Amino acid sequence: MNDYTRTIRLSDTDAAGVVYFASLLSICHEAYEASLEASGIDLKSFFRDSEVVIPIVHAEIDFFRPLYSGDRIIITLTTLQLKDTEFEITYQVGLVAPQSSLIAKAKTRHVAINPQTRQRTPLSESLMQWLKSTENSE
């Protein structure tokens, strides 16, 4: 699953009434989790694995127009494996039809590490399969 739909909630907005930038990054992370789950990865064990953790080491987001409470959005994610220990996810955020223009674009970079040594470690086979199923075909 590369598409995730969601309604913007009041709690996602800031004092100006628009989506707070960190909230949209959090929503993008929801799309990442939903995609992992749809591919058959058990989220409970994925996030509690004691041998490998996958922290985000870089995040960026660009907004092209504001989002408001009640807006229905669709997030399309694609992945790119950068190294045997690292991958990147690109999120394209748009309004659900009839207005399907690009609202925002985000990117997160993730690195697999051993939680005890904090050293890089290869991505798991299940994560490699997920990356292949969601990779950017451009």
Curated annotation (Swiss-Prot):
Signal peptide: none
Enzyme superclass (EC): hydrolase
Cited Pfam families: 4HBT_2
Catalytic activity line of the entry: 1,4-dihydroxy-2-naphthoyl-CoA + H2O = 1,4-dihydroxy-2-naphthoate + CoA + H(+)
Annotated coiled-coil segments of the chain: none
UniProt key word Hydrolase: yes
Keyword Hydrolase recorded: yes
Enzyme active site: D14
Metabolic or biological pathway, per its Swiss-Prot or TrEMBL entry: Cofactor biosynthesis; phylloquinone biosynthesis; Quinol/quinone metabolism; 1,4-dihydroxy-2-naphthoate biosynthesis; 1,4-dihydroxy-2-naphthoate from chorismate: step 7/7
GO biological process: phylloquinone biosynthetic process
UniProt keyword terms in alphabetical order: Hydrolase
Functional note: Catalyzes the hydrolysis of 1,4-dihydroxy-2-naphthoyl-CoA (DHNA-CoA) to 1,4-dihydroxy-2-naphthoate (DHNA), a reaction involved in phylloquinone (vitamin K1) biosynthesis.
UniProt similarity note: Belongs to the 4-hydroxybenzoyl-CoA thioesterase family. DHNA-CoA hydrolase subfamily.
Annotated protein name in UniProt: 1,4-dihydroxy-2-naphthoyl-CoA hydrolase
